[in-house]
Amino acid sequence: MYSVISEKISETITLQRQTSSRYIEFFVFRNVDINELWTTDISEDKTHDVWPAINEKSFKKFLENELTSYQRPISLLGIPQNGTVSKTCKREKQRETDCVNYVRKHGNPVTFYPRHRAKRNANTDTCISEEPSILVSHHRNSKMDVFMDANKITLVNRELIWVPHDQVRIVKLDISLCIPDGFFGVIIGHSNDVFCECITEIITDETDISVFLMNLSEHSLMLLPGDVEFSINFLPCYIPEPWEMINLSPPESAVFHLKTCREFIIKPNSYTIQCFDAMYVCADELKALMIPSKEIIKLGLLIETYIWNKDTIPSIKIFNSTRKTIYIPTGICIARIIFTCGHFCLSLMPERAINRLQVLDASSFFLFHYAAFSNA
């Protein structure tokens, strides 16, 4: 049975997701007055007192009209205004993979897959025959143990990791990922040593993934097995149109680069907050995730991950952990930016130099294919 899950036209629409849905939910919408589909009678003694009752005949007649298939990842909450929302399949018709199938008018079910914006909003539907999956290739001699959950990959060090004093240690994870088109990965690390900071990293489709560890103490650190943990979460990415961006260069593999517009210096063991003349005007449910660039990290600068919202200018907090004054010239890349509909928050870490990013999209599921390899 179909059910309308929007309250009023031209107001904020709240979506209700099925608990068994794993990957994608498809909705259909059309510019009509939703009040025509609702009856004015509201039951007082049943649960219908929350939502208006639905005239099933009128609603079925509406569904027989020409509808537009609108594809969105389940984490992308909210739809364009002036739309009527409905589920396009029944729960008992879902496959074991829990992918939602949209049945065309001729009756043939097709499984869709969220691609990038150009393909997702194209006139022709983009479909695949298999469930979207992520290929994980792990080196047998890796220093990391790999644990695959329903929606993320966790890596824990199984060997000692030496982080020299006043240096940035680059640790190769000896793992490669084949990420489907339209998704990206974000690596969030945590160390049991309060003087060791794990730098957040984003990945699109890399075969040689490495992370940065920064030593903030006055002596070298020896991290024992199990002291460092990395979580790789996968989220849908989004490429805004050129007219939706202000003072940002074209992206490279869905990643934008934020460059300095003026020179500045950072004194030893001190913070500075830099604002940038950039802005974007995308949809409300989209946000930009700003990750420090590798050039800045290698200088010994610690940048806090920033969640950039629309209609605002970004302000980045930079910490100089070295004992020397660092000069930043004009035009250097400070941060990398990727747009997504994922949900994040910054966990307050009073004992740490910077706060830690936390991914809140725990309802998404992925199919991981694991393969171990070794050098010939």
From Swiss-Prot:
Pfam family name, one: dUTPase
Cysteine pairings via disulfide bonds: none
The keyword Glycoprotein appears for this protein: no
Record key words, sorted: Hydrolase, Magnesium, Metal-binding, Nucleotide metabolism
Cofactors: Mg(2+)
Alphabetical list of Gene3D superfamilies matching this protein: 2.70.40.10
Transmembrane domains' residue ranges: none
EC number: 3.6.1.23
Superkingdom: Viruses
Function description: Involved in nucleotide metabolism: produces dUMP, the immediate precursor of thymidine nucleotides and decreases the intracellular concentration of dUTP to avoid uracil incorporation into viral DNA.
Family membership: Belongs to the dUTPase family.
Descriptive protein name: Deoxyuridine 5'-triphosphate nucleotidohydrolase
Organism of this sequence: Human herpesvirus 6B (strain Z29) (HHV-6 variant B)
The organism's taxonomic lineage, starting at the top: Viruses, Duplodnaviria, Heunggongvirae, Peploviricota, Herviviricetes
Name of the gene: DUT
